[in-house]
Amino acid sequence: MERTDVKNNRTEEYSTGQIRCIEKSDPEYPQIMKQYSSMPAKLYVKGRLPDPKRRTVAVIGARMCSPYGRIQAFRYAKALSEAGVQIISGMALGIDSEGHKGALEGNMPTFAVLGSGVDVCYPKSNRKLYERILWENGGIISECPLGSGPVSWHFPARNRII
């Protein structure tokens, strides 16, 4: 895909409402985040935001983790999901990805907060997970503008949202 095609696709997603920009003053902006001054002025959202009436648990951890760690992250997220708890994570390789997969296996939406724009799947190897999160009524969330690639300083900032 050429660069102009990518830009046109992003513009189309945004203009058709597939991607929303939610400002802090918007009623849809998560109330819990409004309590903290360090939160971003706006969020970009593809899909849904977590339901504020449901409990939400973050499943986060190492990218380079043991097989045991992967299994446990998946199991905990699945059990929480089966109990009606929403899972939020960063969609990174390792523990984060297993948390999302466990939530989906437990039949609850899951929410990924990215260190890139919501239109940039990172890591690329998680494309199927990214698409499944959206397909299963979850959401992709970021404070990074559309088209922003993953850069090292985005990830600590992303973590405060999780």
Predicted regions and their residues:
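Glycine-biased, small-residue-rich flexible motifs in mid-sequence functional cores and linkers
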Residues: 2-5, 12-162
